[in-house]
Amino acid sequence: MADQLTEEQIAEFKEAFSLFDKDGDGSITTQELGTVMRSLGQNPTEAELQGMVNEIDKDGNGTVDFPEFLTMMSRKMKDTDSEEEIREAFRVFDKDGNGFVSAAELRHVMTKLGEKLSDEEVDEMIQAADTDGDGQVNYEEFVHMLVSK
């Protein structure tokens, strides 16, 4: 399954994995998963977190390692994101609910995830997705960015 991913995708997933793996020990615990989800405005219960980890945790050790994470991500990519999941992700970034993701909103979410980006890096990310050149990312541009990855 994971062998159908490009090197670039694997590198991106490794970076995402390291955002979750707060202590850098190579595995994601329910606590680490909860921290990231709460930083994104979600409020999962301990039981929900345990359920998510159990779903991915193939070897049954109670944590998610990188190969397990890769398998889950490649599956998720196969079941291309449902419209509702994409809308939900957009809402996480669109803090003020105006239908656009600004550089400030993108920086805010990335900082909460532990990614310290320079203004230039944030601007580059916005420019890469901003096809109509208005300086912010609307829903259609957001979808296009996700689908073209």
From Swiss-Prot:
A GO CC annotation recorded here is: distal axon
Protein family membership: Belongs to the calmodulin family.
Record-linked PROSITE patterns: EF_HAND_1 (PS00018), EF_HAND_2 (PS50222)
Q: What does this protein do?
A: May function as a specific light chain of unconventional myosin-10 (MYO10), also enhances MYO10 translation, possibly by acting as a chaperone for the emerging MYO10 heavy chain protein. May compete with calmodulin by binding, with different affinities, to cellular substrates.
Summarize where Ca(2+) 4 binds, as residue positions: 130, 132, 134, 136, 141
Q: Which Pfam families match?
A: EF-hand_7 (PF13499)
Give the residues the record marks as binding Ca(2+) 2.
Answer: 57, 59, 61, 63, 68
| Annotated positions binding Ca(2+) 3 | 94, 96, 98, 105
Share what the entry says about its subunit structure, partners included.
Answer: Interacts with MYO10, the interaction is calcium-dependent and essential for MYO10 function in filopodial extension.
**What is the name of the protein in this document?**
Calmodulin-like protein 3
Which keywords does the record carry?
Answer: Calcium, Metal-binding, Repeat
Q: What else is known?
A: Binds four calcium ions.
Return the Gene3D superfamilies for the record: EF-hand
Protein residues bound to Ca(2+) 1: 21, 23, 25, 27, 32
What biological-process GO terms show up in the record?
A: establishment of localization in cell
Q: Does the keyword NAD apply?
A: no
- The answer, when asked if Protein biosynthesis is one of the entry's keywords, is no
Q: Where is the EF-hand domain?
A: 8-43, 44-79, 81-116, 117-149
